[in-house]
Regions:
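A glycine-rich helix N-cap at a beta->alpha junction
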Residues: 109-125
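Histidine/acidic residue-rich metal-binding segments in metalloenzymes
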Residues: 134-299
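C-terminal cap of metal-dependent C-N hydrolases
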Residues: 8, 314-317, 367-423
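Divalent metal-coordination and catalytic microenvironments
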Residues: 8, 21, 26, 48, ...
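N-terminal metal-binding scaffold of metallo-dependent hydrolase/deaminase domains
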Residues: 1-38
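Metal-associated gating/positioning segment near the N- to mid-region
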Residues: 49-114
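Active-site metal-binding motif and surrounding structural segment of the metallo-beta-lactamase
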Residues: 35-51
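His/Asp/Glu-enriched, well-ordered alpha-helical/loop segment
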Residues: 197-225, 292, 298-299, 304-378
Length: 423
């Protein structure tokens, strides 16, 4: 099947240009002015919209196998397509945990059967994500994008050192959820003013940055390619910035909710509960500074769906995690590109170029490349209504917020997997 996108604003080589894109047999075969199309080509007029390379999210929870009442590979990847993502990396907190070849194959089978975007699984660092014994990294290495115990911090320094040594030998990234259990003390939101005023148990910032400091030292000693998940504190940003200055092979990520909301926005509602928690204004400002100076390499969603019942128990008792695949680009475009905090090119780098460089997944808008692309109207605004999500998860702090930037279509390998009625 041939499809030609006509009169489009195309994001290519770091800027927008007016061009046509011809897609044939799943690949881009021509980009330019007045592209000549064979007679059997389906022409799509793209007005008031921009074609981007399909975005890359290296931190999502698809929940399958094991927790299909929260999300499935199918619903999660449909949500990804609805948000403009062509590639997602799936975290290993599943049942069974992908900690060996057999359990990983169960996840891969479901991906092959159900995914409508490209899915790259993580392998677990430890058996059962228990932090006691190293998983079978050698057996999983050919099939996984990286290794992580996301959802849990690796408490043992010796196990983390061993994991880093093995990841370096295998040429794999180790992506760490940094959380010191000894400092949690039953906390579930940031230990700031809101927690004190409303008698909630708080999570101190050191529970995150303390493990990052440990891991950065280990990465420097082992030479491991180290990636820090969902950075949320100002101290974490400072530690990573200094590590980069020393030449440590470290990258990091943060999410739209940490860049947008703070503890000042908290309500007694599970849609404001995630791990790590929403922090202070100073922490949020440090994250934005980290984006601007390159300390923070990429934006991810940490898309973590739960059932309606699990998120209806207030701040104290709700499950930790919010969804984000369907709002991520629009949230960042609205908060940072529209007001001139970030140029559009920087946002594309954070959501496509940088994760592609670091993790090796993603495609360019270029002749000969797979036709993985997304179409956004950057002038159209909408109010976030979670009941319209394609994800099974509905909990988001962006509910009711007006965002600008609507995904009109997503194409994967030349196949349209999401499309609004009109472009």
């Amino acid at each position: 099947m041939r499809i030609c996108f006509k009169h489009a604003q195309v994001w290519k080589d770091g800027s927008l240009r007016l061009a046509d894109i011809l897609v044939s047999d799943g690949r881009i075969v021509s980009i330019g002015d007045r592209v000549s199309c064979p007679t059997d080509t389906v022409c799509v007029e793209v007005h008031n919209a921009v074609i981007f390379p399909g975005f890359v999210d290296v931190h999502v929870h698809l929940r399958e196998p094991g927790f299909s009442y929260k999300e499935t590979v199918r619903t999660g990847t449909l949500a990804a397509a609805h948000g403009g993502f062509a590639h997602v990396a799936a975290m290993p907190n599943l049942n069974p945990v992908p900690d060996c070849k057999a359990s990983l194959e169960e996840e891969l089978r479901r991906i092959r059967e159900s995914a409508c975007v490209h899915v790259h699984p993580y392998g677990a660092i430890s058996v059962g994500q228990k932090g006691e014994q190293l998983a079978d990294l050698d057996a999983m290495a050919p099939e996984v994008i990286a290794f992580s115990d996301d959802g849990k911090g690796v408490q043992s320094e010796s196990l983390m050192r061993e994991a880093m040594e093995q990841c370096r030998r295998l040429g794999k990234i180790l992506a760490a959820h940094c959380e010191d259990n000894s400092l949690l003390r039953g906390g579930y939101i940031h230990d700031g003013a809101y927690a004190k005023t409303h008698s909630h148990r708080g999570i101190c910032s050191e529970s995150e940055w303390g493990q990052i400091a440990r891991d950065v030292r280990l990465a420097e000693e082992t030479g491991c390619a180290y990636h820090v998940c969902h950075v949320s504190t100002k101290e974490s940003v400072s530690i990573i910035r200094e590590a980069k200055r020393r030449g440590v092979n470290v990258t990091c990520e943060t999410g739209p909710h940490y860049l947008t909301f703070t503890e000042d926005d908290l309500q007694e509602d599970g849609r404001f509960k995630m791990n790590p928690p929403l922090r202070s204004r100073e922490d949020r400002d440090a994250l934005i500074e980290g984006l601007l100076d390159g300390t923070i390499d990429m934006i991810v969603t940490d898309h973590a769906p739960h059932s309606r019942e699990e998120k209806a128990r207030g701040l104290e008792k709700s499950a930790m995690g919010v969804v984000g695949l369907e709002t991520s680009f629009a949230a960042c475009y609205t908060s940072f590109v529209k007001p001139g905090v970030l140029p559009l090119g920087k946002l594309v780098d954070l959501m496509h170029d940088a994760p592609m460089r670091r993790f090796g997944c993603g495609t360019e808008l270029a002749i000969g490349q797979p036709a993985d692309l997304t179409v956004f109207n950057l002038s159209e605004s909408y109010v976030v209504e979670p009941e319209q999500f394609l994800s099974m998860g509905r909990a988001t702090p962006f509910a009711g917020v007006t965002l600008t930037g609507v995904c009109k279509m997503t194409m994967i390998d030349g196949k349209i997997v999401w499309k609004e009625e009109t472009l």
